[in-house]
Structures are given as C-alpha cells and as structure tokens.
C-alpha cells in the first residue's frame, strides 16, 4: 500500500485506495 505517503491523512488514504 502507500507506506511512503505520511502526508496523506487517513481519509485521503482511504479515498485513494477506493480510486485504485
């Protein structure tokens, strides 16, 4: 997953995961 994007909040990460 995105373990190198700490700048993204949990909400943003979830949205990104949904996109993929």
Swiss-Prot record:
<dbReference type="Pfam" id="PF03701">
    <property type="entry name" value="UPF0181"/>
</dbReference>
<feature type="region of interest" description="Disordered">
    <location>
        <begin position="1"/>
        <end position="20"/>
    </location>
</feature>
<dbReference type="InterPro" id="IPR005371">
    <property type="entry name" value="UPF0181"/>
</dbReference>
<protein>
    <recommendedName>
        <fullName>UPF0181 protein YoaH</fullName>
    </recommendedName>
</protein>
<comment type="similarity">
    <text>Belongs to the UPF0181 family.</text>
</comment>
